[in-house]
Amino acid sequence: METSLSRRTLLGMAAAVPLSAALSACGSSSPGQGGGGATYWYLSGQPQEGVRAGAVDAFNKANPETQIKDTTFQNDAYKTKIKTALGAGQAPTIIWGWGGGTLRSYVEADQVEDLTSWFDEHSEVKDRLLPASFGAATVDGRIYAMPCENVQPIVLFYNREVFDRVGVEPPESWDDIMALVPRFNAEGIAPFSLGGQSRWTNMMWLEFLFDRIGGPEVFQAVIEGEKDAWSHPDAITALTRVQDLVKADGFIKGFSSVTADSNADQALLYTGRAAMMLHGAWSYGIQKAEGGDFVSSGKLGFMNFPPVEGGKGDPGNGVGNPAQYLSVSSRASAEEKKIAKDFFATGVLQDDEVKKWIDNGSVPVRLGTEKLLAASDSADFLQLTYGIASNAKTFVQSWDQALSPTAAETLLDNIAKLFQLSISPKQFATNLNAVIGK
């Protein structure tokens, strides 16, 4: 599983580098608008890279006169490279991304094409995609990106074998979670695995607690720039609840030294050292690939995050990545823009690509895939993922993607401190209020 899907955010990277260095990559094409055809940058790493490349190859074979030249980049370099290229006016025609706050920064700098009228004229393209996928593609009511690839909700995973051994049931509420903590600790099993060194893994807990306690309106107020939004009473309650879990030894000892990018947190679950793990849907593929017979023998359980007693949020709501996104550079030529849009219409999420995503344990953001999902050897998990994505009244984008890069980095720094108990919920709120709208 590529780290782009397990490490969704690329925040806090080195500042600008020389353009010649920033534009070096794994592929063979050159950026910018020269040499004919369109250009497309995306992340390397199998099996996702192979699916993306296959879609480009299929489009090029069907359109020999209008080629797309693709270039791959390692995950940890991509954000800096694309930012540098956009600033220099040398971006590729098609820009791969996560939508949300980063897309807004592109829009405000007039670096990407407004696709609203194109989608109006090509309603058949929009109508084949999950409606929830368009939220992170939209800025101030206008669409600036084509949703693509797969939906990645955050899921509560658990080790069925460990639960059976301890004689307990999966949690149906927050109180159940807190009651399970001493039961597992008494058996020498960590209640929850957590790759806390990576910071964004901690964030998933707050995303769900904010939603389940206060509903989506609490974080939406942050997005809308409402003054002191982080100090909302329900936000303080959510921040307090997660510290209650830390104080109760709810997480693996030394979680702040465990990294998610190395999949160390995944190993804690499938080896039985931890009973549960809150993580992205991509974890299923990692567990399947690295956990021996853990998945095939039915030992991996999964569910949406349970409700919090007295909470205002709908327990069917989801959080995570509603899709990945393709934008068109505003600096591209008219010919290049046409090729990109033709690719969106006839090359993205076609039948072969959809099948490949499903075979890799992912749920594509195309509607009407229920039969393919049901026929997969991962049907139970894929149907859970599809159900969350298609039935959620609200699907909140991962906070570090929804916010601006500046606010997101402050968020991640303070989340780490919150989990280390080095700041209080009120201090967290004060620190985050200072970067609202920045």
Model-assigned labels for residue ranges:
Residues G100-I154:
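Hinge/lid segment of periplasmic solute-binding proteins
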Residues G320, N360-E370, F381-I436:
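C-terminal capping/gating helix-and-loop segments adjacent to ligand/active sites or protein-protein/ligand interfaces
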Residues E2-R104, A109, D120-E124, E335, ...:
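Conserved N-terminal structural module of periplasmic/extracytoplasmic solute-binding proteins
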Residues R142-C148, I154, M178-D228:
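Extracytoplasmic/periplasmic solute-binding protein
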Residues T72-K81, W174-A179, F255-A267:
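Short helix-initiation/N-cap motifs at beta->coil->alpha
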Residues K61-A62, A248, G291-D359:
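Extracytoplasmic/periplasmic substrate-recognition and gating elements
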Residues T116-L129, G196, I213-T237, G291-V295, ...:
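Short, solvent-exposed loop/beta-turn-alpha elements that line the ligand-binding surface or hinge
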Residues V181, E224-S256:
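Glycine-centered hinge/linker elements that transmit conformational signals in sensory
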